[in-house]
């Protein structure tokens, strides 16, 4: 992987790593504002509220997929050395199984709780928004692994790739339909996951 080729004894340096991650957060804040501006202009207030409620609901629900496992990577990753990859694979396998279960259950619950009148047009949206939240949680383990081996700069790029992709696609769908915005929301985390898998 790219991180194996590029790192040569690179260590975790809290001050440096904090700067990289804080910079990524600042960039993503700008992307987040742009995303919300596009959504508020494109949707009626009810649709915007439902979209955000579903997204927030799924982000809360999929914390169950996290299972606290990435914390182990953050704590022990540097000490594990080459063994980190094996631990990461095991964690990813466990999270994938939890993710499959989540995708079967949470979209139905979210759609039932928050969509007025049982509009089936929102069911596809619920699936895509849940998928985006699930993928973000799975990506977190790989991002944490990058940070654990001293590559917070690469983690920063992964974070920006997620929100940046969503923002760019949102602008492209600015005059589009609800499903288009949901697709954009799902593609960003998928791009970030692909990048994280390539990097580690």
Each predicted region: which residue ranges?
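Alpha-helical transmembrane segments of multi-pass membrane proteins
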Residues: 60, 64, 100, 104, ...
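Residue-level recognition of transmembrane alpha-helices
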Residues: 21, 25, 52-55, 95, ...
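Alpha-helical transmembrane segments of multi-pass membrane transporters/permeases
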Residues: 15-28, 85, 127, 131, ...
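C-terminal transmembrane helix end/exit motif
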Residues: 1-3, 7-10, 70-73, 141-148, ...
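Membrane-embedded alpha-helical segments of multi-pass transporters/permeases
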Residues: 33, 37, 41, 64-67, ...
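Signature of the first transmembrane helix
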Residues: 13-70, 107, 132
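Hydrophobic alpha-helical transmembrane segments
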Residues: 123-130, 156-200
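Transmembrane-helix boundary and interhelical linker motifs in polytopic inner-membrane proteins
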Residues: 7-13, 43-47, 61-94, 147-153
């Amino acid at each position: 992987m790219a991180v194996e080729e590029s790192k040569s004894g690179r260590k975790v340096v809290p001050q440096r790593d904090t700067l990289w991650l804080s910079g990524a957060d600042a960039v993503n804040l700008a992307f987040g504002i742009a995303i919300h501006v596009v959504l508020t202009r494109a949707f009626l207030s009810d649709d915007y509220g439902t979209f955000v409620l579903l997204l927030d609901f799924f982000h809360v629900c999929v914390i169950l997929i996290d299972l606290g496992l990435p914390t182990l990577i953050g704590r022990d990753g540097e000490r594990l050395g080459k063994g980190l990859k094996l631990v990461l694979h095991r964690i990813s396998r466990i999270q994938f199984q939890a993710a499959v279960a989540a995708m079967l259950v949470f979209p139905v619950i979210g759609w039932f709780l928050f969509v007025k009148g049982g509009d089936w047009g929102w069911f596809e949206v619920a699936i895509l928004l849940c998928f985006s939240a699930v993928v973000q949680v799975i990506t977190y383990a790989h991002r944490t692994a990058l940070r654990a081996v001293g590559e917070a700069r690469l983690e920063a790029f992964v974070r920006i790739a997620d929100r940046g992709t969503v923002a760019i696609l949102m602008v492209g769908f600015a005059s589009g339909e609800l499903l288009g915005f949901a697709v954009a929301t799902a593609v960003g985390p998928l791009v970030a996951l692909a990048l994280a898998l390539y990097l580690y």
